[in-house]
A protein has these predicted regions:
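Phosphate/diphosphate-binding loops
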Residues: 2-33, 256-292, 296, 300-343
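Glycine-rich, proline-tolerant flexible connector loops at the mouths of alpha/beta enzymes
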Residues: 229-244
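Conserved small/polar residues in nucleotide/adenosyl-binding loops
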Residues: 349-356
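Alpha/beta enzyme core
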Residues: 213-227, 279-280, 284-287
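Extended, highly charged accessory segments
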Residues: 31-36, 40-198, 204-212, 217, ...
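A glycine-rich phosphate-binding loop feature that marks nucleotide/adenosyl-phosphate handling sites
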Residues: 140-146, 230-233, 268-275, 336-349
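Alpha-helix-loop-beta-strand connector modules within alpha/beta enzyme cores
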Residues: 242-261
Length: 360
């Protein structure tokens, strides 16, 4: 301990999460957190005029379902939805705006050993950080965590002479509702292309994945900035390729071709339901996710008046909020503070063993 004269102390305080302190010894100056960040940010002042907040253009309102009745039930069966999933996972997320809680432990069989159908994301288990990269408290340190999702190429942010002059589009969350997704596609009308992620009996998954990769590469080289991977075309003749494989294949292929930074990979899938499924999709490279089947299943329960006084838009908002909170929790376990650092990082590991290796 060093004794100091209290009269010589100009200010007292402590560093909070994400804050820094600078000292310039030769000039005898101390710079607080705000001074340092203002100094660094002034180099990018012109970015303010280029940043466009998409949340203002894509509000959650006028939500509507896509499928209903027999079509919806067939899709739920196709993607492995059970009554337990709808009642114990989906319903609490919309009702309480947070993940459902249950007893400690998971005594279900590993997906690879199960004799029942299990979605591919069940084969993935979440990792957690070790001492070298401590976890973050997503509740108390939420100021340093963000789900902001950016569209557009920033170029090399370390090269002040070669910064992009294009607009930068930002969303506060990577989760898009059905109405938001429809407006999103319309907004990027000339710069988006949809790739069908279903295959028929004349194809196999490996050949379809190769086709999807090549199609994505061609679109990017043509100047497309928004690729949409969709399994909505599923039918009696068309079977969905697991979206995890599609995203992983496209993300890895474009990265190898040094094209990934020029495009966003947007996903429209019936697979996404709980926070783990969203986390795995983003973890293998998805930029945004539209869980159309989960939202339609939500509407099905809303029509049965199972949410009491809540309007459908409120149910959707609460569901999206619960997914966002779940993503922050999963990221915090790995000590990751922003979604862009989690995206494509593959911080989960898998128990899956395939007889034929498919490069994703």
């Amino acid at each position: 301990m060093i004794e100091l004269n209290e009269k010589k102390i100009i200010s007292k305080g402590r560093l909070g999460p994400g804050e820094i302190l600078g000292v310039r010894i030769e000039k005898g100056k101390v710079f607080n957190n705000k001074d340092i960040k203002n100094y660094l940010a002034k180099e990018y002042k012109h970015f303010n005029n280029q940043i466009i907040d998409l949340d203002k253009k894509l509000p959650i309102k006028n939500e509507k379902n896509i499928f209903s009745g027999d079509s919806l039930r067939k899709l739920q069966h196709c993607f492995g939805y059970s009554l337990e999933d709808l009642e114990l996972i989906l319903h609490p997320m919309a009702e309480d705006a947070k993940e459902a809680t249950g007893s400690m432990g998971d005594d279900t069989p590993l997906a690879v050993l199960s004799n029942k159908y299990r979605p591919l994301y069940h084969f993935f288990r979440q990792n957690f950080s070790q001492v070298t990269n401590p976890p973050i408290d997503s509740l108390r340190e939420n100021k340093v965590m963000s789900l902001k999702t950016r569209f557009g190429n920033l170029g090399n942010i370390l090269d002040f002479n070669n910064l992009t002059e294009e607009n930068i589009y930002v969303l506060n969350s990577p989760i898009l509702t059905n109405n938001q997704f429809e407006k999103f596609v319309s907004f990027f009308d000339k710069n988006n292309k949809t790739i069908d992620c279903t295959f028929n009996s004349d194809e196999n998954i490996e050949s379809k994945l190769n086709s999807i990769k090549q199609e994505a590469e061609i679109y990017v080289r043509q100047g497309v900035t928004q690729i949409i991977l969709s399994d909505k075309n599923v039918s009696k003749e068309n079977y969905p390729v697991p979206m995890l494989l599609c995203i992983g294949a496209v993300h890895t292929h474009l990265t190898k071709m040094k094209l990934r930074g020029y495009v966003s990979i947007n996903v429209q899938t019936g697979e996404a339901l709980d926070t783990h499924s969203f986390a795995t999709l983003i973890g293998v490279g998805a930029t945004t996710v539209n869980p159309y089947l989960a939202l339609d299943s939500l509407y099905q329960r809303f029509e049965k008046k199972l949410f009491g006084k809540f309007l459908y838009e409120e149910c959707v908002e609460r569901y999206v909020k619960s997914v966002n909170l779940g993503l922050l929790k999963i990221m915090s376990k790995m000590g990751i503070s922003v979604i862009s650092s989690y995206r494509g990082g593959s911080v989960s590991y898998t128990h899956l063993t395939l007889p034929t290796t498919v490069q994703v």
